[in-house]
Every structure is written in C-alpha cells, then in structure tokens.
C-alpha cells in the first residue's frame, strides 16, 4: 500500500480513537447522572442524602487521584505552594462542594430531563459572571443570545409537569456556583500560569471539598443517618457509583487534546438529548411538548453561542499565527540586510 494509503489509515485510526473516547465520555457522564438519580430518588433506591453521596465520591476520587499521582506516577504532579493552595484552590474547592451538593440535591425533587433543560442556563451564568468580574467583554449580540437561552428555559419550565420550586432553586444555585467556579479558575489559577487537568484537580480540590462538606453534613445529615438503624452501607452500589464518577474524570483527562472544542460541545448536546429520551422512555418521567419546544429554543441559543466562541477562538489563533509569521519574516529580512551590509563593507583585493 502506498504512502497515501498509510496516511489514510493513520487518519482513520486517529478518528476512531477520538470518537471512542467521546463515546466513553458520553456513556460515563450519562451513567453518573442516572446512577445518582437512582440512589437519591425516594421512588427508587431511596437514599436521599446528597451531602453524604458527594462526600463518598470525594473520598474515593481523592484516594485514587493520590495513587495515580504519587504511587503509580501515571500523572505528573503540579508543584504548588501552601500560599497558592490557600488563596487559589480553597475558594475553588468551596464553590465546587456547593455546586455538587446542590446539583445532587436537585435529583430528589426534579426529573432528569428537566434538570438537563435547566443546565442549558450554564452559558448564561458563565457569561454574566465573567462580565461581572471583567473576564468577558459586554456585547449586545451575546446578551441577546443569553436572553434567548433564558427565554427557552423559561418556556421549558412553564411546561414542566413535575415542577418543584425548591428543586428549581437548588439546580439554579448549582448552576450559579459552578459558573462562578469556572470563572474563578480563570482568575485564580489560569492567570497565574497554573494548569490542572481533571486528575490533578481531584488531587488538590477533592480533599478540600470533603472538608467543606463535613460541616453541613454534621448538622443536616449525620443525625438522621445515626438514627436510621435500618440502613446498611452497600459497598457494591456506592463503590460502583464512586468508580463511575472517578472514571468520568479520567475520561475527560484522556480526551483532552484528542478532540476539538466543537466535538466536545456536540458530544455534550448528544448526551443531553439521550438523557431526556431515557428519562421519558425508561424512568417514565413526563416530557411535554412545551418542555421540548422551550428546550429546543435554548438548545439553538447554546449551539449558536458555542459556534461563536469557536469562531472567535479560531480567529485568535489565526491572528497569533499571522503575527508569528510576520515576526519571523521581519527577523529574516534583518538578517539578510545585515549580511548584505557586511559584504559591502568587506575590503576589495
């Protein structure tokens, strides 16, 4: 087979590997969401203790992250001073613990499908908080896009058959804390040149989350668990659930650099629609036409936002490349002029 054939085989192999990783990420993300719903929902496994579940996840993930970094040397550790940890990682850990606590709590009150629809507000929250902290520039066009997403989610909420005010407050709170966490990562870590992949993030952030969650757990859930004599810790259920949560982070780590931002965004959309379909067909949650119409509007707004962000990123990369080419051209011209000037100054025989 010729050189062209070998190249084609290599390209095909890379495509297969990339989309295999994407499929694994979709599967694990889907599994974690449905599994958490199964454990927390009072009509299913009936263990409505979201703080405890989150603490189990954090304990499991921090232990495995420690083993991968310190024992098996699978991931390179990131050097970090105590001052940097306290000033940068601890606030992010606090926000992450609140986001996980509230998002897991929402599964007790809301359907999986409706939660996915509410999560469409994430770009709105990230953009708004980014503008507030001056990490994003205010643009009328982008704000109109954000309003269209919000309008779509409002329609979806209006058509929700199992609308629960407390559940919606919890999920919106989770979105707000998660969006703030993402902006804080830019301010407290990225701006300082600190880059954490999902595994090193768990290594540094998970123990911090565990410490923050311990305070509300002692007050809210521990007294109830202590008095519930009928409960026995199911190692199979909680072990496999925690393993899926960690595997999801590992899948994200493996996926970094294998696909484009557009591919990841499309994968996220596919996952959301699959969850809505699963929630309707298997869990038997009610999904109304108004739900779908509203989410459709929000989905188009999110798709346009992702497309605009990707185009801006491409334009920035193209400008950076052009600048590098201009600098290289200027350097070569200077060298050429210098060489010519040197030859002119040489004495003739």
UniProtKB/Swiss-Prot annotation:
It is a multi-pass membrane protein. The chain crosses the membrane at residues 15-35, 49-69, 89-109, 113-133, 141-161, 165-185, 205-225, 236-256, 263-283, 286-306. Residues 38-156 form the EamA domain. It comes from the Eukaryota. Signal peptide: none annotated. InterPro entries: Sugar_P_trans_dom, TPT_transporter. One of its GO terms (cellular component) is Golgi apparatus. Keywords: Membrane, Sugar transport, Transmembrane, Transmembrane helix, Transport. Its main location: membrane. Residues 321-349 are annotated as: Disordered. GO terms for biological process: nucleotide-sugar transmembrane transport. It holds the Pfam family TPT. Disulfide bonds: none annotated. It is found in: Membrane. Residues 328-349 have a biased composition (Basic and acidic residues). Belongs to the TPT transporter family. TPT (TC 2.A.7.9) subfamily. This is Probable sugar phosphate/phosphate translocator At5g25400. The lineage of its organism: Eukaryota, Viridiplantae, Streptophyta, Embryophyta, Tracheophyta.
């Amino acid at each position: 087979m010729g050189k062209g054939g070998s190249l084609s085989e290599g390209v095909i192999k890379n495509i297969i590997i990339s989309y295999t990783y994407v499929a694994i990420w979709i599967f694990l993300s889907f599994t974690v969401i449905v599994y958490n719903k199964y454990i927390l929902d009072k009509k299913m496994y009936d263990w409505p203790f979201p703080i405890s579940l989150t603490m189990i996840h954090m304990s499991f993930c921090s232990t495995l992250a420690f083993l991968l970094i310190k024992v098996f040397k699978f991931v390179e550790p990131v050097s970090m001073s105590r001052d940097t940890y306290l000033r940068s990682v601890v606030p992010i850990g606090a926000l992450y613990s609140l986001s996980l606590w509230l998002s897991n709590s929402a599964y007790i009150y809301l359907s999986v499908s409706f939660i996915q629809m509410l999560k469409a507000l994430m770009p709105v929250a990230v953009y708004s908080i980014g503008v507030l902290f001056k990490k994003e520039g205010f643009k009328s066009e982008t704000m109109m896009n954000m309003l269209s997403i919000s309008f779509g989610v409002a329609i979806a909420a209006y058509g929700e058959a199992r609308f629960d005010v407390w559940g919606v407050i919890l999920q919106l709170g989770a979105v707000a804390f998660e969006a703030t966490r993402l902006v804080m990562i830019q301010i407290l870590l990225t701006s300082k040149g600190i880059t954490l992949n999902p595994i090193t993030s768990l290594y540094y952030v998970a123990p911090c989350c565990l410490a923050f969650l311990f305070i509300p757990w002692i007050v809210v859930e521990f007294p109830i668990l202590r008095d519930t004599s009928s409960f026995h810790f199911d190692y199979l259920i909680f072990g496999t659930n925690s393993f899926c949560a960690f595997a999801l982070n590992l899948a994200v780590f493996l996926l970094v650099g294998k696909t484009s931002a557009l591919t990841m965004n499309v994968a996220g959309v596919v996952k959301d629609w699959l969850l809505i379909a699963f929630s309707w067909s298997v869990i038997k949650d009610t999904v109304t036409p108004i739900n779908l119409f509203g989410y459709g509007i929000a989905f188009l707004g999110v798709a346009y936002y992702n497309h605009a962000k990707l185009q801006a990123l491409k334009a920035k990369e193209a400008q950076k490349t052009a600048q590098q080419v201009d600098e290289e051209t200027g350097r070569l011209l200077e060298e050429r002029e210098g060489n010519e000037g040197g030859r002119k100054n040489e004495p003739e025989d």
